């Protein structure tokens, strides 16, 4: 298997509507569903939920 098949690069987009994104890798075997993480959005200066964008 290729490196990108197991751990592809994904974008995490802010739910605050600012358009701010984080880029990370995800293990498809352990997390087949979409990821949601609480991270800092510097545009609104708060911790908000970021969801995986496909």
Curated annotation (Swiss-Prot):
A GO molecular function assigned to this protein is:
structural constituent of ribosome
List UniProt keywords, sorted A-Z: Ribonucleoprotein, Ribosomal protein
Look up the domain of life of the source.
Bacteria
Any one GO biological process: translation
Its Gene Ontology cellular component terms are: cytosolic large ribosomal subunit
Gene3D superfamilies associated with the record: Ribosomal protein L33
User: What Pfam family is a match for this entry?
Assistant: Ribosomal_L33
InterPro entries named in the record: Ribosomal_bL33, Ribosomal_bL33_CS, Ribosomal_bL33_sf, Ribosomal_zn-bd
Keyword hit for Ribosomal protein: yes
Q: Entry's SUPFAM superfamilies?
A: Zn-binding ribosomal proteins
Of which family is this protein a member? Belongs to the bacterial ribosomal protein bL33 family.
Checking HAMAP family in the record gives: Ribosomal_bL33
| Protein name, entry field | Large ribosomal subunit protein bL33
Q: Which organism is it from?
A: Corynebacterium aurimucosum (strain ATCC 700975 / DSM 44827 / CIP 107346 / CN-1)
